[in-house]
């Protein structure tokens, strides 16, 4: 295993250049194998979990879901606030920011982005809860692709470009996750569900996040600095793939639901009209049947 890891490190160095020494020795970052193994285990559970649960009763998980979602809401809020203050203190350039230009502020960003990387491992639990509760319809291609890819992408980001221009997407994503996990946490409480109105806007926010990240990343291509261009091109490509998947998810989830509701409403309206017409027509029948013929006067 050590020989394989050494060979892998040599390959990565030839492909991507030397690693950033500031994260040397950090948990899970020295060696890619643990991240890769976690991802493989995740995909195996996605595949085998629903099969295992097929003939079993779903678990409620309500109590642990409240705690889990509250924890991720607070972690996301912490990361968002720390990234915003770190960028402000380091006077980061929106258009392009190198990885070694802001001193201690760069280190603050790196520490927060490690938590961001680690949170992607924690978020595997999203899928596991879907499986345990038998909500398999929520395990979409978008869901699995996003969860499995983010952990691996951020392992590479943390080892080669752990600050600088890498901050933007993580900052937006942390803010979106504050909204998303607070929604999921509150929806675990049945009495709160009638008051939760912002689910649709979370998906819109995720789409907007991807578009804004492409715009900000493209600025680094148009007005380059010391941040490696290859990472920027990769970021743009990845965001385009997410936009395609999120757009498809949005259309499938909301436009079709809206069309279905309109169709049901029209059907109900037509049925109601027929009932009214039939009622009106039939209402004369008893009256007509009850009319007695007048007797002719016999004067």
UniProtKB/Swiss-Prot annotation:
Catalysed reactions listed for this entry: a very-long-chain acyl-CoA + malonyl-CoA + H(+) = a very-long-chain 3-oxoacyl-CoA + CO2 + CoA; (6Z,9Z,12Z)-octadecatrienoyl-CoA + malonyl-CoA + H(+) = (8Z,11Z,14Z)-3-oxoeicosatrienoyl-CoA + CO2 + CoA; (9Z,12Z,15Z)-octadecatrienoyl-CoA + malonyl-CoA + H(+) = (11Z,14Z,17Z)-3-oxoeicosatrienoyl-CoA + CO2 + CoA; (9Z)-hexadecenoyl-CoA + malonyl-CoA + H(+) = 3-oxo-(11Z)-octadecenoyl-CoA + CO2 + CoA
Name of the featured protein: Very long chain fatty acid elongase 5
Gene Ontology BP terms: fatty acid elongation, monounsaturated fatty acid; fatty acid elongation, polyunsaturated fatty acid; fatty acid elongation, saturated fatty acid; long-chain fatty-acyl-CoA biosynthetic process; sphingolipid biosynthetic process; unsaturated fatty acid biosynthetic process; very long-chain fatty acid biosynthetic process
Pfam family membership, one: ELO
Keywords: Acetylation, Cell projection, Endoplasmic reticulum, Fatty acid biosynthesis, Fatty acid metabolism, Lipid biosynthesis, Lipid metabolism, Membrane, Phosphoprotein, Transferase, Transmembrane, Transmembrane helix
Biased segments, Polar residues type: 279-288
Compartments, record wording: Endoplasmic reticulum membrane; Cell projection, Dendrite
E.C. number: 2.3.1.199
Pathway: Lipid metabolism; polyunsaturated fatty acid biosynthesis
Name of the gene: ELOVL5
């Amino acid at each position: 295993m050590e020989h394989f890891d050494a060979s892998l490190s040599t390959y990565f160095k030839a492909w991507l250049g030397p690693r950033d020494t500031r994260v040397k020795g950090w948990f899970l970052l020295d060696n890619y194998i643990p991240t890769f193994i976690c991802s493989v285990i995740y995909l195996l559970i996605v595949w085998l979990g629903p099969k295992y649960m097929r003939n079993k009763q779903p678990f409620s998980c309500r109590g642990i879901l409240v705690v889990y979602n509250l924890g991720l809401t607070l972690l996301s809020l912490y990361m968002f606030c720390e990234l915003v203050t770190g960028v402000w203190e380091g006077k980061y350039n929106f258009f392009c920011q190198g990885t070694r230009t802001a001193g201690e502020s760069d280190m603050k960003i790196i520490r927060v982005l490690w938590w961001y990387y680690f949170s992607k491992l924690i978020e595997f639990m999203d899928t596991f809860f879907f499986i345990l509760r038998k909500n398999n319809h929520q395990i979409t291609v978008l869901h699995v692709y996003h969860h499995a890819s983010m952990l691996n992408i951020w392992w590479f980001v943390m080892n080669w470009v752990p600050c600088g221009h890498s901050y933007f997407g993580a900052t937006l994503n942390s803010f979106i996750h504050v909204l998303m996990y607070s929604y999921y946490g509150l929806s675990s409480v049945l009495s709160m569900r009638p008051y939760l109105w912002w689910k649709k806007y979370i998906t819109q926010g995720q789409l907007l996040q991807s578009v804004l990240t492409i715009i900000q990343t493209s600025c680094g291509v148009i007005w380059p600095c010391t941040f490696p261009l290859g990472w920027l091109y990769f970021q743009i490509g990845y965001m385009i793939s997410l936009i395609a998947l999120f757009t498809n998810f949005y259309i499938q989830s909301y436009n079709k639901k809206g069309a279905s509701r309109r169709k049901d409403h029209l059907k109900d309206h037509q049925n109601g009209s027929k009932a009214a017409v039939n009622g009106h027509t039939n209402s004369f029948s008893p009256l007509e049947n009850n009319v007695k013929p007048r007797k002719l006067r016999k004067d």
